[in-house]
Design a protein with these regions (language model features):
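Extracytosolic ligand-binding ectodomains
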Residues: 1-394
Length: 394
C-alpha cells in the first residue's frame, strides 16, 4: 500500500510494489507489478508489512526496492515449504509522516513489520507495534536506543563501536601466540584508529609485544618489524585499496628475501569489495576479514539466486556490498520461518533458527531485561593458503 503522503512519483518512475501480495506458486516481475489486493487471509498465513522507501527517485529507494524484491523471492520459496504469507508494502520516503501509513487498517493486522529506514520514523512505528503486539524488524542503520525499552523491536544493525569490540575480541582469541605487526599507511582520511588503538591497548594489557612500521620504511627497516620465529599478523591502519596494494607489494618483497617467514593479515570489511583484484593475495597471506555478512559469488546457491533475480526482474542486482536483494531474502526467511515455527516465542536467539543464510546471518540477544532484541551475528571470513574460504562464526 502506498501511503497518501505529499510525496509524488515523477513521470517515468517504475515501481514493482504489490498491494498486498499473496505469494503464489509461480512468481515473476509482472506478478509484482500487476498484483491485486490479496484475498481473505488463510488461517495459517502470516501477515507481513514492509514500510520502507520503495521508489525509483534516489539511491535509498532503489536499494530498498531491491531489498523488497529479495524479500518477495523468499516468500515465494517459503510457499514451497507450505508457509503462506500475505505481504503488504507501504512506500515511506524520507519526508513521509509514517503515522499516515499506520492509519491503514492492514497495518495493525500484521504479525511483523520491516522498517523504517529513517530514524525519525522509528518511534511512532515502534509505539504502534508495541500497542498492537507486532514484531518490528529494523533492518538498517538507525540512531537512538528505542530497542533498549521496547520488547517488540528487533534491531539488525550493529554500531561501529560494537563491531570494533567484536573484531578485537576475535583477534585476541584467534592469535594469542602470534606477533602483531601494525603498518602505518600514512592515510590521513582513515577512520580505523578506533580499531588499531583499541587492539594495541588490549595487547598491552595482556603483555603481548608487537611492532609498528610504515609503508615508507626501507626494506631493511620494514623487515625488522617481523618475527622470524612466530607467525606475524599484519594490521593496516586503513581500509583503502591503494594503501593495501602498496602493503602487499612490500610483503611480496619481504617474503621473497625471507621465504620461511609466516604471515597472516587481519583486515577490514571493506576488503570484501576488493576480492576480484586481491583474491590471490588474500589466499597467499592467509587473510582474515571481520564482517557481519559474506557475499560468496562462487557459491552455487548465490549463483542460482542471481539467475532467478535476473529472470524475474530482467536486471542484475546492484553491486553494493552487502547485496540488498540477498539481505531481504535472508531477513524474510529467518523471521518468517521462525514465526511460523514458534509464533510469539520466536526471539531469534541462538538455536531457534535452522535457516542457513545465503549472505546475511542473524543471531539476536536481549538488548536489556525489559527491551527488545539486538543482532549479534559476527564472523571472520578466512582466505586459506589452500585456496579455500571458511567463515568462522561467533
Amino acid at each position: 500500500a502506498i501511503s497518501d503522503t505529499d510525496y509524488k512519483l515523477k513521470k517515468g518512475d517504475k515501481l514493482f510494489i504489490p498491494y498486498p501480495v499473496k505469494t503464489t506458486d509461480t512468481f515473476d516481475a509482472g506478478a509484482i507489478k500487476n498484483a491485486k489486493k490479496a484475498e481473505t487471509r488463510k488461517p495459517d498465513a502470516l501477515r507481513v508489512g514492509i514500510m520502507l522507501p520503495l521508489h525509483d527517485v534516489d539511491g535509498d529507494g532503489r536499494r530498498m526496492v531491491e531489498y523488497y524484491r529479495g524479500f518477495l523471492m523468499a516468500c515465494d520459496s517459503l510457499r514451497a515449504k507450505g508457509i503462506s504469507t500475505d505481504v503488504y508494502a507501504w512506500n515511506v520516503p524520507a519526508d513521509a509522516d509514517i503515522r499516515i501509513s499506520l492509519l491503514d487498517d492492514n497495518a495493525k493486522r500484521c504479525d511483523m513489520i520491516f522498517g523504517p529506514l529513517y530514524t525519525r520514523q522509528l518511534k511512532p512505528l515502534a509505539d504502534f507495534c508495541r500497542a498492537n503486539d507486532i514484531k518490528l524488524i529494523v533492518p538498517f542503520s538507525i540512531s537512538g536506543n528505542e530497542v533498549e525499552a521496547n520488547p517488540h523491536i528487533y534491531q539488525v544493525y550493529q554500531s561501529a563501536e560494537t563491531l570494533n569490540e567484536r573484531a578485537i575480541n576475535a583477534f585476541m582469541e584467534r592469535f594469542p601466540d602470534c606477533h602483531p605487526v601494525f603498518i602505518d599507511c600514512n592515510d590521513t582520511t582513515s577512520n580505523k584508529g578506533m580499531f588499531t588503538f583499541g587492539l594495541r591497548k588490549r595487547l598491552d594489557a595482556k603483555g603481548i609485544s608487537y611492532s609498528i612500521t610504515n609503508l615508507k620504511s626501507s626494506e631493511a627497516y620494514f623487515a625488522k618489524a617481523f618475527s622470524t620465529s612466530k607467525r606475524n599478523v599484519v594490521i593496516l591502519n586503513t581500509g583503502r585499496s591503494p594503501q593495501l596494494n602498496v602493503a602487499l607489494a612490500k610483503l611480496d618483497g619481504l617474503t621473497a628475501t625471507n621465504p620461511g617467514m609466516r604471515i597472516s593479515m587481519f583486515g577490514y570489511t571493506e576488503w570484501l569489495m576488493y576480492t576480484k583484484v586481491y583474491l590471490n593475495y588474500f589466499y597467499k597471506y592467509n587473510a582474515y576479514i571481520p564482517t557481519t555478512f559474506y557475499y560468496n559469488a562462487l557459491s552455487d546457491q548465490t549463483e542460482a539466486f542471481e539467475n532467478s533475480y535476473r529472470k524475474w526482474f530482467r536486471t542484475d542486482m546492484q553491486t553494493a556490498l552487502p547485496r540488498f536483494a540477498l539481505t531481504g531474502y535472508d531477513h524474510a526467511r529467518f523471521f518468517i520461518e521462525g514465526e511460523y515455527a514458534r509464533g510469539k516465542s520466536f526471539r531469534g536467539t541462538k538455536g531457534q533458527s535452522a535457516y542457513r543464510p545465503l549472505q546475511t546471518p542473524l543471531k539476536f540477544v536481549y538488548a536489556s531485561p525489559d527491551g527488545g532484541m539486538r543482532n549479534s551475528a559476527f564472523m571472520l571470513v578466512h582466505y586459506m593458503s589452500s585456496r579455500r574460504i571458511e567463515s568462522i562464526s561467533y
